[in-house]
Amino acid sequence: ELEHPFTLVFTLANLSRIYTSFHNVNRALEFADEAIAVSTQYSFALGLALATASQGWALAEQGHEAGLGKLIHGISATRVTGANLNIPFTLALLAEIYLRNKRIDEGLGTIEEAQKLAGTGGELFWHAELLRLKGELLLAQSDLSVQAAEQCFSEALKIAQAQHATMLELRAATS
């Protein structure tokens, strides 16, 4: 057992985020719930915010309507702490939920915000995933957007290959 609650919270929150990137809902939720419990016990606002976002994503993936609200709350709470790291990734999760719920305009707006934040913050690791999701949203928006969507997928694939990001490359290639 780890006797340092601050380290424990961030380990749990980061494990939850890792499992969200693999779309492993059950493990993401398990670690998020643990991080929330410890964060609440010790009043760790950032750990609570990060874990709440992951928990919200997992619940939304399971079809719980409250999940979307928790995800949005987690993003807002993270921003309140002044932390900006991983916000583009979390916004990508939000855009994915919007896509699944056919809320295309909100999804596209979320992707646009994530791309701006990633560019200004130098957080470009998820750039390929943001482009892939933009392509998926464009495809869902209209048949007139097919060419723009294909361009997003192509660019996402090139970026993922250049970054040697195999997981993101596979996602882009299968979109």
Q: Which residues does each PLM region occupy?
A:
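Helix-coil-helix junctions within alpha-helical repeat/solenoid scaffolds
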Residues: 1-175
